[in-house]
A protein has these predicted regions:
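Patatin-like phospholipase
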Residues: 1-113
Length: 113
């Protein structure tokens, strides 16, 4: 969840808890084919060490439930395996990007065959 930002006088907030995979707004805007990205596929929840971890896991579980519901409406789903990554660890972003790229390439290869 990112800090809200103001752009052109409007306050924009992270939609991760509500609209993590915005399939419905895309359909409403006229999209006929929607590719969703499921960043919660195969997630392992870490054993909580303190109350902050408990709340963090609760938020992760809520986000994952919303994501599953929304990705079911997509026509195609890219689902990189991110079980070894934490949503809160920003130091591994290059690895996450590479994993997403790899997953997308694999999906495209399947579609071509």
């Amino acid at each position: 969840i990112f800090v809200p930002v103001e752009i052109d006088g409007e306050l924009l907030v992270d939609g991760g808890l509500i609209e993590n995979v915005p399939v419905s707004p895309l359909r409403e805007a006229g999209a006929r084919f929607v590719i969703g990205v499921d960043l919660s596929a195969g997630r392992d929840y870490q054993r909580p060490q303190d109350i902050i971890d408990v709340f963090a896991n609760a938020i992760d579980i809520a986000i994952d439930n919303v994501t599953r519901s929304q990705t079911s409406e997509a026509d195609l789903i890219v689902a990189p395996r991110l079980s070894s990554y934490s949503r809160r660890d920003m130091s591994r972003i290059p690895e996450l990007i590479e994993e997403g790229y790899r997953s997308t390439e694999q999906l495209l290869d399947k579609l071509k065959s």
